[in-house]
Amino acid sequence: MGDIPAVGLSCWKASPGKVTEAVKVAIDAGYRHFNCAYFYHNEKEVGAGIRYKIKEGAVRREDLFIASKLWCTCHKKSLVKTACRRSLKALKLNYLDLYLIHWPMGFKPPHPEWIMSCSELSFCLSHPGVHDLPLDESDMVIPGDTDFLDTWEAMEDLVITGLVKNIGVSNFNHEQLERLLNKPGLRFKPVTNQIECHPYLTQKNLISFCQSRGVSVTAYRPLGGSCEGVDLIDDPVIQRIAKEHSKSPAQILIRFQTQRNVIVIPGSITPSHIKENIQVFDFELTQHDMDNILSLDRNLRLATFPITKNHKDYPFHIEY
């Protein structure tokens, strides 16, 4: 496979009304990697931005690296291709450069029975959000009876048929990734494991494990965000290092990941932030800087997905 661009634009939480313009700004700023997902419910608008810049002649499709993700209600093998085609249709693309299993957990599909007509599935997938999180009377997700090893076989078929160039996973712990890598008859290894990663959740052990197995790591939420009064951007250590390098705190947080050989996908719809976030290749953090940032680790996970904690494949019950 070709290398995944080191910095990409995450389209998570980018409202449909603003993400098209954000994609245009990003391409002009030098971004070539765009991280999408069915669950973000904005793929149509992301695709509009991509097509605009291609038509304009600013970029070619083959210059771009477009990733999307399989949602949890479509883990049954017979639904994987339909879900992938849905994302391709929304993006108006012929292929994806990367397709990920969004979470290792399969949910009950949007129909009471596993067998679903194409028209029913088409309706569910064209009304995003309606059936994404099937809940029981306790407001916990209703699991499906799938196994991600079976889902992976359908993901591999997408590569064979040319719908996607590469496949990977997201939010897998090391035991789940090891189980996948040891799968009998494995045709394609996951090229990356996309995980939450920032200085308050450095993921040192999981990154080491993935890289030792030849699986790259992609960091989502690299700027941390705010949770329970904690805002990583305002951390005194990050602020000090930023001042020393005459860079923004966000640039320090992004550079921190690239120096760990971790792909990083910050998200923003603000043009100035989009441009700033990719300007991280003209300076280098010292080893002292890196050690100080690593020392901030507090195992603070922001994306805990609590309504799935009872699922057999919930990934965060173990240390890494």
UniProtKB/Swiss-Prot annotation:
Pfam families: Aldo_ket_red. Its main location: cytoplasm. Inhibited by p-chloromercuribenzoic acid and alkyliodines. NADP(+) binds at Q194, I265, P266, G267, S268, I269, T270, P271, S272, H273, I274, K275, E276, N277. Substrate binds at H102. Keywords: Cytoplasm, NADP, Oxidoreductase. It catalyses: 1,5-anhydro-D-glucitol + NADP(+) = 1,5-anhydro-D-fructose + NADPH + H(+). The active site is at Y40 (proton donor). Its EC number is 1.1.1.263. Belongs to the aldo/keto reductase family. PANTHER family: ALDO/KETO REDUCTASE. Monomer. Catalyzes the NADPH-dependent reduction of 1,5-anhydro-D-fructose (AF) to 1,5-anhydro-D-glucitol. This is 1,5-anhydro-D-fructose reductase. It comes from Macaca fascicularis (Crab-eating macaque). The gene is AKR1E2.
